[in-house]
């Protein structure tokens, strides 16, 4: 939600005019105000019923569930039935995931799903996110004074919060995940290229160019949180197979961290006047990388909106193109019946052949 980042930038901005040791001591010291309310909140928070069920503590799970549930006489809520469902679901999950290994993530159709999940997360950094993480320093190098640079940074983190809620709303009204992700990347690419071209503005108009750059950073932040920054988590949860979901998510997050480290090392060199000193021209680099992400998303990332997990499994098994996921019709029940009938026929075929041959021998 970026609330912590917004508060942090606001505190640092208020310290800009101080030139004593408290300019850095106060921001550090204010961090000591958070442990106490967090500790109190942790003590008051109820335990997860699912966690208790997985450890066989069903009675404690029922108490936690009742504490978390608003009891309404008009509803048919039954705590015992809910706990029974949790116990059954936990047993099924344990049965399904038994014997699964990380190597299974790279076998058969699961290899494609693992690749997509990993790339969806990596694209969060490759689309220019690490560039925006240095927005204050970048804007100062672009020509803004420190106060205005921090003001734009506050606007950026504030608009990030708006973008998260906006993404939730757009997905709620029915806009597809692939659609949001793909068109969001297109918007990010345009914003990055615009920032790159602003570096070509003559030095006489540097002040106007720096203000325009700050404005583009805010628009970039809005596009990012409306799409890639928020939708990626939905895609990761829906596109990974149930049996290997935890392992697939771990692999995806590991790649995200590796890419984040690489981008975090490169970006300061791009912006530092004593190093590569690219300034606004770094927008061309990240814009080019973002364009490659658009190409990948167009050809590889499917649309999971409105699909059950069983339907997604069938679509991946049939190797349906990512661009045709939304329009392909599948019937899970027909598929299951036809497949099981065919397998049953195949298994009985030798016996039928032997019986027919024996009948021929008898009649002859």
Name every feature range the model reports, one short phrase each:
Residues 68-82:
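Short intracellular "coupling" helices and adjacent cytoplasmic loop segments at the cytosolic face
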Residues 79-92:
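Cytosol/matrix-facing amphipathic helices and coiled-coil assembly/linker segments
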């Amino acid at each position: 939600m970026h609330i912590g980042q917004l508060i942090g930038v606001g505190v640092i901005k208020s310290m800009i005019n101080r030139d004593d040791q408290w300019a850095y001591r106060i921001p550090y010291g204010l961090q000591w105000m958070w442990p106490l309310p967090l500790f109190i909140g942790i003590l008051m928070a109820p335990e997860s019923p699912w966690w208790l069920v997985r450890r066989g503590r069903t009675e404690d799970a029922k108490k936690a569930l009742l504490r978390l549930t608003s009891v309404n006489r008009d509803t048919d809520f039954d705590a015992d039935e809910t706990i029974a469902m949790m116990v059954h679901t936990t047993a099924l999950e344990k049965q399904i995931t038994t014997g699964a290994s990380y190597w299974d993530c790279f076998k058969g159709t699961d290899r494609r799903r693992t690749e997509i999940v990993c790339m969806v997360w990596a694209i969060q950094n490759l689309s220019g996110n690490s560039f925006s993480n240095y927005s204050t320093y970048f804007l100062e190098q672009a020509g803004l004074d420190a106060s205005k640079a921090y003001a734009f940074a506050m606007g950026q983190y504030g608009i990030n919060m708006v973008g998260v809620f906006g993404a939730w709303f757009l997905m709620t009204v029915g806009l597809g995940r692939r659609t949001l992700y793909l068109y969001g990347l297109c918007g990010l690419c345009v914003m990055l290229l615009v920032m790159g071209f602003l570096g070509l503005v003559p030095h006489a108009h540097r002040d106007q160019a720096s203000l325009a750059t700050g404005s583009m950073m805010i628009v970039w932040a809005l596009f990012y949180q409306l799409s890639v920054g928020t939708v990626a988590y939905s895609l990761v949860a829906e596109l990974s197979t149930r049996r290997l979901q935890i392992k697939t998510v771990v692999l995806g997050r590991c790649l995200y961290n590796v890419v984040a480290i690489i981008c975090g090392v490169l970006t300061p060199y791009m912006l530092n006047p004593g190093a590569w000193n690219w300034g606004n021209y770094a927008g061309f680099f990240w814009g080019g990388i973002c364009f490659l992400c658009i190409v990948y998303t167009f050809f590889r990332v499917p649309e999971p909106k409105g699909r059950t997990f069983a339907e997604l499994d069938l679509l991946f098994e049939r190797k349906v193109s990512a661009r045709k996921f939304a329009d392909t019709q599948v019937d899970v029940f027909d598929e299951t019946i036809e497949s099981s009938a065919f397998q049953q026929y195949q298994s009985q075929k030798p016996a039928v052949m032997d019986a027919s041959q024996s009948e021929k021998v008898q009649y002859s």
